């Protein structure tokens, strides 16, 4: 399913028909997966662990250290978040765990903006361009829930005359 919230309906229909089911790269929520186990249904999920993906994203940023990240000198990492689909559990986990990794590294964070980019490069480019116009040099980190949106963010950052990792 495109939206994780529809997994229960799909699972019920497929199980009623007696067909095994594999969800690929769209992880249903934990309650739904627990339901499969409780009912001993032939249903599974195959894909990446979005919690881990978010954690890795945050850890890569945290490795830079607060001295490099805190360009405006307020003692915090000021960031914007460009999310995928808000109903998608992967987007929710990537959003939560990327920021949590910075906090776990002892960094104080400050969310300047959070927008939904719907996994789309052009939409993310527009959202980041608007955020840069609104928040200027205060934006120190741009989180994106997928690579397409990250490419859009990069284009917006470059168009604003900034260089990733430098300013």
Regions found by a protein language model. Give the residues of each.
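A residue-level marker of the well-folded mature domains of exported/periplasmic proteins
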Residues: 1-167
